């Protein structure tokens, strides 16, 4: 087994998210998520099947965009946006994942509705350089 590095882990996780959430290629996504995947999110059913089932049943227009990824050993944190959810607002999400034996093995998240300029107390966008329209 090759030694993992932060850069390799980042590329692995970004490819996994692209494969599942944007391409919706569930066969290929199975190569990234452990069969024993542990889910801590209150929004996602347990296990790999729970996650894949949620994505399968979600809106076809759902899209994931990443703006930041950080790695420390086998733990990674991503800051991203899910749009096209069929909800009044996009979701701004911080995902924390753990890699084990070459698979995504565990997941936690924090989810917040993306707000407009008018609703932002800070006056700063939550994702990227611009507020949603």
Predicted segment positions?
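C-terminal and inter-domain tail/linker signature
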Residues: 1-133
């Amino acid at each position: 087994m090759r030694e993992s590095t932060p850069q390799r882990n980042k590329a692995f996780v970004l490819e996994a998210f692209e494969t599942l959430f944007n391409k919706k290629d569930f066969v290929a996504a199975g190569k990234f998520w452990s069969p024993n995947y542990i889910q801590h999110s209150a929004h996602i059913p347990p296990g790999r099947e729970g996650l894949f089932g949620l994505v399968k049943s979600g809106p076809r227009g759902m899209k994931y965009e990443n703006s930041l990824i950080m790695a420390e050993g086998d733990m990674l944190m991503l800051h991203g946006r899910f749009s096209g959810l069929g909800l009044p607002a996009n979701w701004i999400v911080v995902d924390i994942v753990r890699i084990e034996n070459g698979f995504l093995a565990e997941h936690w998240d924090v989810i917040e509705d993306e707000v407009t300029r008018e609703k932002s107390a800070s006056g700063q966008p939550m994702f990227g350089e611009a507020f949603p329209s």
